[in-house]
Amino acid sequence: MFDLTIEASQCLQSWLCENGIREVKSNGSKLIEEGLISEHVLVLLNGQIAVNTTDQNGASQRLAVLNQGAIVGEMSWLEQRPAVADVITEADSEVLFLSVDLLDKLSNDEPELAAEWQRLIARKLAAQIKSQNAWIHRYEGPGEEIEPLRKVLVLFAVLDDLDVEQIAKMGSLRRIAPGNILLKQGEEVPSIYLILAGEADIWVNIEGINKKVGTSRRGELLGELTLLTSESQGASATVSSTDGMELLEINKNDLQKALSEKPAFADRFFRSLSCMMSQRSRDQLLARQLAARSRSAEADDDGDELDLGQLGGINRAGQRFHTLCQKFQSGGETRL
């Protein structure tokens, strides 16, 4: 289980404690409310918290019980969308409240700490998705992710043009024939893959039975969780494609080298990765008719019109992805 007090450097922990607000909350205190956008990211310093979501019938469903070092509220911060669950203390607890405005400024103020923070958030979400994959199949629903357009753009909305160019230099085109398998659960993941075209099915073996837990579409990464684990545990799921895919196969060693040498790039890359995984986690819940109050809050929101800044960001992200696709699909180096 993820524990920030173990995972984070002493320097980052000191910065968080100096800039956050410590509060002691009694048993039964609601820290985050499903359906509302959280103004803080929270770190549990001591105690215990429960994470409960709402199903389509309005009943509470427990997602997790978390202990010291847990981080909550990061999904709402990353996506600027309503929280998918209530977070309630299960015992008297000490909680560190981190303002989202403060965290947004960290990139400019402390780029190396920002890169470490974003990587920790990505690792936390990776652990969350791995846990979620183990039980999400128990809930009925269409089982298809919501709003694929968001996923196409999320990586390229955070990265800049030079970042995308740098990633392109690390990659080559790979085609997966219809019905073939890209990754097998538990086996080594030699590269990171960006879907340029097609769709991937994600399967997890649970007690000897393969269960489909999601899909990934163009603009998403595959194999990215291996960047976030301290030990080589192999692929967390099997990835196949019914109709075939075109992928940008990214050299993992080159990518890790660039991430370690360039804090600003690492900050943007891990934030984009976290946004993608946050959406993946949210979509799994929504596809199984969970996070009902969050879904309702977004449906009731009349402020769906995008401002010029958002439209500009979407346009730039789309252009970056289109340029990358053109570069490789029109004659780049190909691997079958």
What do these predicted regions represent?
Residues 1-336:
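Cytosolic regulatory regions built on CNB/CRP/Popeye-like sensor folds
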